[in-house]
């Protein structure tokens, strides 16, 4: 992979590790609308976000929505667990069936390249840094980040934008 984010053209160029440590090429999401979210299990927003994300997954996976969740411990140490514990928690408490990935960093020089790309394409307010857990990026069927949402924006609040992209074939 190139070290310059200017050469990245879509999310399909990235390979990430899933929650079990297995390499996953994001090419597998080609043709789908993706919602990419940095998550944490011990955040005040955990319950609302995981419940809404899972419910949306259940309803919209058949229409082409894919939710990609990336645990991150950069905000208040609210994702301290190892991947096996994270997986157990979200599966048992929320019945999570959407795709969970290994813990990453989303800010700083050692941020995951996928997040460097997302932030370069959809800038934040005041700063490009991810501000907290449950920041969201909406990616179209061509692998292009088209919208960025703040951590306080609930999944249900962006459903209209998701539906608009799902209706575009």
UniProtKB/Swiss-Prot annotation:
**The keyword Oxidoreductase appears for this protein:** yes
What InterPro entries does the annotation carry? Glutathione_peroxidase, GPX_AS, GPX_CS, Thioredoxin-like_sf
Catalytic-site annotation from UniProt: 43
Record-linked Gene3D superfamilies: Glutaredoxin
Any one GO MF term held by the record is: glutathione peroxidase activity
Q: Which GO terms describe its biological process?
A: response to oxidative stress
Q: Which SUPFAM superfamilies match?
A: Thioredoxin-like (SSF52833)
The name this protein carries in UniProt is Glutathione peroxidase
Encoding gene, per UniProt annotation: GPX1
């Amino acid at each position: 992979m190139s070290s310059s984010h200017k050469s990245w053209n879509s999310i399909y160029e990235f390979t990430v590790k899933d929650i079990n440590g297995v390499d996953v090429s994001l090419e597998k999401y080609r043709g789908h609308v993706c919602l990419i979210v940095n998550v944490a299990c011990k955040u005040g927003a955990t319950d609302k976000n995981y419940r809404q994300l899972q419910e949306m997954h259940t309803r919209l996976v058949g229409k082409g929505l894919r939710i990609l969740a990336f645990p991150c411990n950069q905000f208040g140490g609210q994702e301290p667990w190892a991947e096996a514990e994270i997986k157990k928690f979200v599966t048992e408490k929320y019945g999570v069936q959407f795709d969970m990935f290994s813990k990453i960093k989303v800010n700083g020089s050692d941020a995951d390249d996928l997040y460097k790309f997302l932030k370069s394409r959809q800038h934040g307010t005041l700063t490009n840094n991810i501000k907290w857990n449950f920041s969201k990026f909406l990616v179209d069927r061509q692998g292009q980040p088209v919208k960025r949402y703040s951590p306080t924006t609930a999944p249900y609040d962006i459903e209209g934008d998701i539906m608009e992209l799902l209706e575009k074939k």
